[in-house]
Amino acid sequence: MNTIERALMHALFVHLHHNIDQAVDFKALEELNRKVSQQWPGALIVGPGDDAAVFQMPGIEGYLVAKQESHCSPCVPRPYDAAATGAGGAMRDVTAMGARAIFLLNFIGTRSLEKEVLVGPCGFVGKCTCGKCKVMTSQERLDLMVQGLRDMCAVMDVFVIGGGLSTSFTDIVPAVVVAVIGKLITKEPLTKPAKVAGDKIIIIGKTASDGNDTLFRAGLVPEMRPAVALFDEERTTLEASLAAFQTGRIHACSDLGAAGIGAAVCESARYGGFGAKVDLSAVPVKGEELTAEEILICETQARMVVQVSPADADEIMGAIESKNGIAAMIGEITSDDKEVFEYRGQTVATIPNKPSKEILESLKGGD
């Protein structure tokens, strides 16, 4: 297990599930689902395990899609971008199911508004040693977070229909939680799991070196660079994705969020019972020299991956490009039980669908 494999597997099998029981009251959720299923049998069409939930509401024709997401820690160094990318990420999750986002609700929890907070790379430790941080009031930071949410909604034509605020938080990290609701535009919901061995994997959008949290924790980069909000690119990716969906030829789809291409491909293949082979050299990147691990794992915004049969690939690429989207074929689904990532002809990471007990213990123990 090399360093890149360790970083990606830690993200897949440990970090993405870390402390989730403290963020989600599973007993309350189970009870709520039980009550809903009793009152509206069969209402939940796609539940936990995919990018968003798909459900039916009595008296409303068609399917609704909803996603709730928190984006808290990134608000310490970059409150504006973090709030905007939290909203944009939830919107992409809704889009990935074959829907167009319509409404957003939000909740923000922060310190008392008159309290001072340190915003920047050193915000977590409370003392600036980098010279890049700024001291501001909690009110000023709140204003930035609210503006980030509003600006993303404005670009994406999503209505903010409600929100909540608490100023009783004492932690350095504020809480930013958004819920996005949309309407399905495809005949049936799109889902994350891979469907057919041999399907081509197409990426929409360009990759950069921001959103490198996973790499930073693994010691593969010297500085954490939170994801940057990409407003116009988000809108372009939205319209390009919807154009691809309307061909009716998409087999699987996933938003690129935490751990980037690596997580999206590995989860899709694993959930479908397949493997995958990806050429990272084929990934469109922004004009900087990215390393293989940055292309694989960085969480650059405004990206999506879809899977299609080889015969339909050109049609899908054309649909994406008709909306000025950037698209590239980067790999294919295989009948294997692992995901193989190559860069310039060399294998840089091989991720098993079922890591051994020893590997999992090593990841959890940080050995």
State the predicted function of each range.
Residues 224-263:
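Polyanion-binding loop/helix "lid" in catalytic or ligand-binding cores
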Residues 2, 16-235, 243, 276-284, ...:
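Glycine-rich phosphate/pyrophosphate-binding loop regions near the starts of catalytic domains
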Residues 1-23, 27-28, 132-134, 152, ...:
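Glycine-/charge-enriched secondary-structure boundary and capping motifs
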Residues 89, 148, 239, 264, ...:
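Short Gly/charged-rich anion-binding patches and loops
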